[in-house]
Amino acid sequence: AKHRGLTMFFLDMRSEGVEIRPIKQANGDSGFNEVFFTDVRIPDSQRLGGVGDGWKVALTTLMNERLAIGGGISTGFPEIKALAETLPLASGQAIDDPAVRSKLADWYAKSAGLKNTGARAMSALSKGEIPGPENSIGKLVAGGMMQDIAKFALDLQGLGGLITDPEIARSQAQIQAMLMRSPAVRIEGGTDQILRNIIAERVLGLPEDMRADKGLAFNQIPTSESK
């Protein structure tokens, strides 16, 4: 009931009345913006899908986004493998340390799984099929893996991991940037918690979460003001 009546449009960001203000982030980048609309009109020629089909279009967009994020981002496995092969530890090269090798083996297996999952999804796309909820797996695994690898790489380097200037140490700076970027990957396109629910309910067929608002329109949901 909540999704009826929603219609999606695309907007030319150069349209009159559109103001974009970059948001300065803690890591110094501006990957997000505030967008203000002043008397902006969008013609029907910029409608996506049918009238009332906005929710369907939004879900299709999100599924494609999750597929792109899960299959397109670098999880950092090539970087951590290269680091382990060249980084000296007190006991020898990092790659020879059993604890490091165990981590690398785990991440290699996950990387192979992501690659094969992405290949199945791309095969389905080539046949004109719409990405399904199973593509949430790739995005969920890739985001967590990226963050875990970045943290481990920094710990492995010790004080050397604090270097952020690519002119001094390019690989260390890349890992720093990866660590700063990784929390956003676990939020954009659907948080880890949302994706776990999708996988549980729509892929594994587990019971849905209890919801008091299920089947009710927004204006029918009880609130403190309606009492």
Describe the function of each predicted region:
Residues 68-129, 133-152:
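Extended amphipathic alpha-helical segments enriched in small hydrophobics
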Residues 1-85, 206-227:
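FAD-binding core of flavoproteins
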Residues 22, 61-67, 100, 126, ...:
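Short beta-alpha connecting loops at secondary-structure transitions
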Residues 136-227:
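Alpha-helix capping/hinge segments and adjacent helical runs
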Residues 6, 32, 52, 111, ...:
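Active-site lining segments that contact anionic ligands and/or coordinate catalytic metals
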Residues 16, 55-62, 81, 116-120, ...:
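Short acidic (Asp/Glu) and glycine-rich catalytic loops that position anionic groups and cofactors
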Residues 2-6, 94-102, 171-176:
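Glycine-rich, flexible loop segments associated with nucleotide phosphate handling
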Residues 50-51, 96, 171, 187:
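Residue-level signature of the cytosolic catalytic core of signaling kinases
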